[in-house]
Structure formats: C-alpha cells, structure tokens
A protein has these predicted regions:
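Long amphipathic alpha-helical segments
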Residues: 1-87
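Short, glycine-rich nucleotide/cofactor-binding loops
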Residues: 5, 17-20, 114-116, 120, ...
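Alpha-helical scaffold segments in soluble metabolic enzymes
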Residues: 10, 14, 29-36, 50, ...
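Gly/Ser/Thr-rich loops at beta-strand to alpha-helix junctions
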Residues: 24, 114-124, 147
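Secondary-structure boundary motif
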Residues: 40, 57, 111, 133-134
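Non-catalytic, soluble scaffold/interaction modules
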Residues: 50-77, 89-94, 98, 103, ...
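Ligand-binding beta-strand-loop-alpha-helix segment within the catalytic cores
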Residues: 73-111, 124, 129, 136-183
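Conserved phosphate- and dinucleotide-binding cores of soluble alpha/beta proteins
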Residues: 135-137, 143-284
Length: 284
C-alpha cells in the first residue's frame, strides 16, 4: 500500500488532535487543508485515496467529516483538477447547508428568546450571527463545555456581536434551563433510529429540558446522517490528561467526548432540507 507523505501525515494528525472545533468547522478545516495539499503536492491517486480513507476513520463520532470525504471519493479520477473541484464543491455544499439551517431556525423562534446551548456548534453560532444581523433581540446561556472549554470561544464570539451571554459550568445546566425559552444544540451524527450523537453533557441537558417542559431543537444538516447500526457507533475518548485528575493507583479518569441522545427528548430537527417534528414536540 502507498505510504502517506509527510504533508498527508501532518493533515491526518491535525484532524485527530483537534478536540475544540465542532464537526462542521473541523470538516471545513480539513477540506481547506485538502485543497492546499492537492494544489501543492499533487499526490498520486492511490496516495490520495488512502489519505481520504484514513481521514474518514479518524473521527468516528463526527460523521459529517466521513460523509463529506465519501462524496469527494465518489467523484475522483486520475485528474488532480477534478479532485480539487470535488473538494471545493463539497465544501460549498456544507457551508451553504449551515446557512440554510440558520435561516430555517430563525423563522421559528419566539420573540426576544433566551436560548440555552451546550458546546460550540457552528450551526448554532451561524443562527446567532443571523439573529444579530437581523437586529433581533435575544440572549444566550452557554455552558463552558469542559474539559475543552469550547463554550468560552462561543461566549467570546457573542460578546463581539454585543449579545448578552451568561456563561455557566456544565453542572449548572439544570439550574438554568428553567430560565431559557428553548434549548438549541448542534449535532455530530444523526443515527438511523433518530437518536443523535453530540458532545457529552447533551443528554443531561436534554433530560433537564424535558423535565422543565422546554423544547429542544437540534440543528443537523444531512451531512450528519448515518446508516450505521446505532449500537456499533464508536464514541471517541480523548486523553485523560485533560481532566487533570489526581494521581492514584485506584483512580481511573475517563474522558469520553461524545454521547447518544434519545430521539424521544428532541422536539425538532432542523436541517437544510426542512424542519422535522420529533417525539418531544409539544402537542397543540
């Protein structure tokens, strides 16, 4: 099998090491790096196919990356220019899907909503930017999302938009859900049984929202659809060192980054294809 060159290995390592970016942003970053790689290295077809295969397997909990790369692979030929165009086209489709989701969600929001979110979804941030551009009054409650603290980057982005944001620890989700009008999260993978995978803590947030009678909207484009058996999906575990656990022979720190969230707790799924009611949608 063709050995990966140093540039390809670096690209693969960067994808594996990024534990801060959301699925969409990580996919876009990877596609941008692929464009540079194709343009500057002009790899042989076998090398590029192997790189795509290894990239697809690198982040199993973020199916959007694997789906985007699979779509590129379907269009490949021996011509580097064809590969470049395929990457650019898929990148545009992914970026446009995020914008469409934001517009779909915007039309459904109540007046002056208080929105609670967890982690730092690109789709959720796109919605917030859209709301700010439309000068719609709203405020946000966001978790800091430990151990990566990507909620801090979301809080900074909202601050730059002059949007009021309350930053809380993940442990305070149950306290603050009653103060929100609705909960909105992103999604890393939408499973065939309707459950979805997202940053750990999302399941607890969904349970808190359900208990408080607050709707849970999931922003999930079609790139996140997975046909895999839900029971076989790998939930990525990151280095335990991120937890800064005390040393001890009887201490075992665990750092599982993603979890499944039951379909029954979801009120709406909003994708670029439309708005889909789910089991937790309030009956009228």
């Amino acid at each position: 099998m063709q050995e990966l060159d140093a540039r390809a290995k670096s690209l693969l390592a960067a994808l594996k090491a990024d534990s801060r970016s959301g699925a969409t942003q990580l996919a876009l970053n990877t596609l941008d790096q692929l464009l540079s790689y194709l343009d500057e290295v002009e790899p042989e077809g076998e090398t590029f196919l192997r790189l795509l295969a290894e990239l697809r397997a690198a982040r199993p909990s973020m199916i959007v990356i694997g789906n985007a790369l699979a779509m590129i692979e379907q269009r490949l030929s021996s011509d580097v220019q064809v590969a470049l165009q395929a990457v650019m086209d898929i990148r545009d489709q992914l970026e446009n899907a995020t914008g469409t989701i934001a517009r779909q969600a915007l039309d459904l929001l109540p007046e002056s909503p208080v929105i609670l979110t967890h982690s730092a979804s690109s789709a959720v941030l796109a919605l917030f930017r859209n709301m700010a551009e439309q000068r719609q009054a709203f405020s946000v409650i966001c978790t800091q999302s430990s151990p990566g603290f990507e909620g801090h980057s979301l809080a900074r982005a909202l601050n730059e938009l002059a949007i009021p944001v309350t930053l809380i620890t993940d442990a305070q989700m149950g306290l603050f859900v009653p103060q929100a009008d609705l909960v909105i999260t992103g999604c890393d993978t939408w499973l065939s049984n309707g459950h979805f995978i997202n940053k750990s803590g999302t399941h607890l947030l969904a349970l808190a929202a359900h208990a408080a009678g607050k709707p849970l909207w999931v922003l999930a484009d079609s790139f996140r659809n997975s046909d895999a058996d839900p029971g076989s999906v790998e939930l990525e575990e990151m280095p335990a060192e991120e937890l800064n656990a005390p040393p001890g022979d009887w201490i075992t720190p665990r750092n599982i980054y993603f979890e499944r969230v039951p379909h029954a707790l979801v009120s709406k799924r909003i994708s670029e294809l439309g708005v889909f009611s789910c089991p937790a949608e309030p009956r009228r």
